[in-house]
């Protein structure tokens, strides 16, 4: 009997699987979200970072000395692989303007009489400035300037000592009695593709898995086929859900395994662990993500609402995975909430295997938690069945809407219709409330700590001396670092690192103090994990600062080892002072750099969603014989486009004031731009986004499908904008793609205006408005051709070489070009 029941259950499971496979192959949407988008995501993350190195970053040099020494410094800067000297300035103001315009990312100032002051030891100074509103670039430039100019700083004393017959090694030991040897583990080149490609592929992938799972189940209830689905499963909800999701699980698992082979194979991301174990954890992660989607949908199975919630959950997972900003540095409620996301546990397990070659014993808790998501979904399935039966009963007594004639078209009627459609649609109101207000507040709150503080470090002190204890005490006192514990065993410290308890290891050798006492250079070793670049950056900065303090305190003790002429060299010369200034992000915080870009993406993404959802609803209404608006002439088309654009524009003016005006004040995000300039920038951005959305929305045949496509790209917009990684270092095809979407250029433009303090007057000299090109929207109905036009391809603020002369002419040409392109657009609408 049991065998017979099992046979019936397996037969029902096979029937549900075949039914779902037929549904998947009957709509191009499923091919796109199950195959095309994941493969595109894999290609995107595998190629977006180019060679992964921050090299050839454009910088400038302001040489006000014009001597042999200053030219030698310029050659030294040009020879550094991080820099690409694109321009030599004769005025610091010109260099600052170039930095504001993003022609360069930093510049070095060599002041007048530098050589004379360096030779005479009268306070020679070198100052460098770097664009810290772009954190990744700013950090690289700061480190490169410090490393390149370090020999220059000591050169006056070294040259004077060598001229008096003292060896360079002897004077170098006196100047730097303690030196650091820093070893970034696993990723010694600090390659961004190694750091970000693997985790962010799965971050994007989990958004797609969540949305596809909810849509596949929710579409059964939406299109009235839930009864047939449950009946085919013989009334067993477990069979119904398992059969429906199994085809997606197999496809997503195949793509996840393929991604592992691509990332650790052709992309050459180092991986010494078990690929079989990594693939097994990947499949478990995919199933756990599907289980989370089932759980969320079962709580309240209204696809119009829940798919919006799930899109926000998926996007929040990108932040709470802890890849870029460590979750441990966030507020306690955010840290606790991160464990509600499967991607967080998968990231912990994957990084343990990738970075530390850890075995299963080190991340079994993460694997166990992924199984808990599956258990939670199984326990809530009876509730989902109850909802389905309730929906079937309501369908039986509900009356289908009767067709109604389209309303007379006028601009005022289009505006009234659009306002009414937005105000009476709970799903769209949820997107606006959640995407604009909740999302904006949450992102600011999550990144409110802004800086990574007290990164734990293990100390292996084999010296047990007064000097080593002083160094440890000073290191623990820095804001970036906290001493987790001390151990005499380096292997125990490595165990702490594998377990994720510490982010680095400080190794003080047995002769740490003895070498200083003998007049020799003493070296301490810092081993730092690179699974979070911000942790590594904090450890590196804190150890370097403590090293400088210790050197200053103990340098005079080394005078007994110098010959008289060495003392004369030290007394008669002085080192060059090297100072750096971070511009446009005075807090040097991660949130201060990322949040402005995220706010622009929120505006762009939610507007696309709202317009596409409304257009999808109209497509659903047309299939039911309800035609709300019909364009029979060019004038009608212009009324529809103009009326709709007016509604979206006015709505998002208010939202922009909240996101770009109120939130920066509430969360102390640096901003020095003019409100008028930002308004001027937002006008073409909002218009361009509206036109783009009207053009692409015709491809969506229901109101939920847009969220599958649009929400998926939320993280990609940030990368493509050039804020996280310099646009100049990306492959040419991604540089071109940057201009296809208004969000990319608008992100850069907003940062230039708001954080760099430029004005639109100077921006127009560099900005070329391509205008608005026409796009034709054709309805798919066989009995009617809808000639309403979607205007797309926002004149993408193409950045061209700066025009520093004839600024007023440039502004006039910019406006004339914009007007001409608008007239051309109107002529093309046919």
Name each model feature, range by range.
Residues 2-193, 395-592, 801, 814, ...:
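Extracytoplasmic/periplasmic domains immediately adjacent to an N-terminal transmembrane anchor
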Residues 45, 66, 97, 250, ...:
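Membrane-spanning alpha-helical segments of multipass transporters and channels
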Residues 69-73, 213, 225, 349, ...:
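Hydrophobic alpha-helical segments typical of transmembrane helices
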Residues 20, 24-31, 243-249, 282, ...:
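Loop-to-transmembrane-helix entry motif
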Residues 10, 14-18, 194, 233-234, ...:
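Alpha-helical membrane-protein architecture signal
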Residues 822-829:
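Ser/Thr/Pro-rich, intrinsically disordered low-complexity segments
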Residues 40-43, 183-263, 441, 581-664:
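Hydrophobic alpha-helical transmembrane segments of multi-pass membrane transport proteins
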């Amino acid at each position: 009997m049991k065998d017979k029941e099992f046979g019936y259950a397996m037969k029902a499971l096979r029937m549900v699987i075949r039914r779902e496979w037929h549904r998947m192959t009957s709509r191009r949407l499923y091919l796109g979200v199950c195959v095309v988008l994941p493969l595109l995501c894999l290609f995107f993350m595998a190629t977006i970072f180019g060679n992964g190195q921050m090299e050839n970053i454009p910088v400038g040099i302001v040489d006000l000395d014009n001597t042999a020494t200053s030219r030698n410094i310029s050659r030294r800067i040009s020879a550094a692989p991080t820099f690409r000297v694109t321009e030599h300035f004769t005025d610091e103001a010109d260099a600052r303007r170039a930095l504001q315009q993003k022609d360069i990312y930093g510049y070095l100032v060599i002041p007048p009489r530098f050589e004379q002051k360096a030779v005479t030891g009268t306070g020679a100074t070198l100052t460098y400035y770097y664009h810290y509103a772009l954190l990744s670039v700013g950090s690289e430039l700061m480190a490169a300037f410090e490393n390149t100019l370090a020999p220059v700083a000591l050169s006056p004393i070294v040259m004077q000592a060598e001229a008096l017959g003292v060896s360079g090694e002897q004077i170098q030991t006196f100047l730097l009695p303690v030196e650091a040897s820093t070893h970034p583990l696993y990723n010694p080149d600090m390659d961004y593709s190694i750091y970000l490609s693997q985790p962010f592929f799965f971050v994007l992938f989990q958004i797609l898995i969540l949305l596809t799972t909810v849509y596949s189940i929710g579409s059964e209830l939406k299109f009235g086929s839930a009864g047939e689905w449950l009946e085919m499963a013989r009334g067993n909800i477990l069979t119904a859900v398992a059969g429906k999701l199994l085809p997606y699980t197999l496809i997503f698992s195949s793509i996840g395994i393929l991604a592992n082979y691509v990332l650790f194979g052709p992309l050459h991301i180092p991986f010494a662990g078990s690929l079989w174990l990594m693939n097994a954890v990947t499949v478990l992660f995919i199933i756990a993500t599907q289980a989370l989607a089932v759980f969320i949908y079962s709580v309240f199975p209204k696809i119009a609402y829940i798919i919006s919630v799930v899109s926000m959950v998926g996007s929040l997972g990108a932040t709470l995975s802890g890849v870029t900003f460590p979750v441990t540095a966030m507020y306690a409620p955010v840290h606790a909430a991160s464990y509600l996301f499967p991607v967080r546990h998968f990231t912990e397990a994957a990084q343990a295997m990738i970075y530390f070659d850890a075995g299963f014993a080190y991340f079994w808790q993460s694997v166990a938690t992924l199984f808990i998501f599956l258990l939670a979904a199984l326990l809530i399935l009876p509730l989902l069945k109850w909802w389905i039966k309730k929906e079937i009963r309501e369908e039986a007594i509900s009356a289908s809407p009767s067709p109604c004639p389209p309303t007379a078209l006028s601009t005022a009627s289009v505006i009234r219709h659009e306002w009414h459609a937005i105000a009476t649609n709970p799903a769209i109101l949820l997107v606006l409330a959640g995407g604009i207000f909740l999302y904006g507040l949450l992102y600011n709150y999550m990144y409110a700590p802004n800086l990574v503080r007290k990164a734990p470090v293990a100390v292996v002190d084999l010296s047990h001396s007064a000097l080593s204890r002083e160094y440890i005490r000073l290191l623990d006192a820095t804001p970036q670092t906290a001493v987790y514990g001390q151990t005499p065993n380096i292997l125990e410290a490595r165990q702490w690192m594998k377990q994720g308890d510490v982010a680095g290891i400080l190794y003080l050798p047995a002769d740490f103090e003895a070498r200083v006492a003998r007049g020799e250079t003493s070296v301490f070793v810092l081993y730092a994990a690179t699974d979070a670049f911000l942790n590594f950056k904090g450890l590196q900065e804190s150890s370097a600062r403590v090293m400088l303090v210790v050197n200053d305190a103990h340098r005079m003790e080394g005078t007994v080892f110098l010959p008289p002429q060495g003392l004369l060299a030290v007394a008669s010369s002085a080192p060059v002072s090297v100072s750096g200034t971070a511009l446009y992000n005075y807090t040097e915080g991660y949130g201060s750099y990322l949040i402005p870009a995220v706010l622009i993406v929120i505006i762009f993404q939610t507007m696309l969603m709202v317009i596409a959802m409304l257009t999808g609803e109209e497509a659903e209404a047309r299939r039911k014989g309800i035609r709300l608006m019909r364009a029979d002439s060019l004038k009608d088309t212009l009324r529809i486009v103009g009326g709709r654009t007016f509604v979206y524009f006015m709505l998002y003016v208010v939202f922009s004031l909240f996101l770009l005006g109120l939130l920066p004040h509430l969360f102390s995000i640096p901003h020095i731009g003019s409100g008028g300039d930002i308004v001027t920038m937002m006008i073409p951005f909002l218009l361009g986004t509206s036109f783009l959305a009207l053009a692409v929305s015709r491809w969506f045949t229901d109101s939920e499908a847009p969220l599958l496509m649009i929400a998926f790209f939320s993280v990609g917009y940030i990368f493509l904008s050039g804020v996280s990684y310099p646009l100049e270092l990306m492959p040419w095809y991604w540089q071109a793609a940057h201009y296809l979407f208004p969000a990319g250029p608008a992100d850069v433009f907003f940062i230039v205006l708001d954080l760099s303090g430029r004005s639109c007057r100077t921006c127009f000299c560099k900005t070329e408005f391509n205008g608005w090109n026409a796009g034709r929207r054709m309805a798919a109905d066989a009995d009617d051709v809808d000639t309403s036009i979607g205007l797309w391809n926002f004149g993408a603020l193409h950045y061209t070489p700066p025009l520093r002369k004839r600024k007023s002419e440039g502004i006039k040409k910019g406006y004339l070009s914009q007007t001409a392109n608008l007239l051309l657009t109107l002529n093309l609408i046919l």
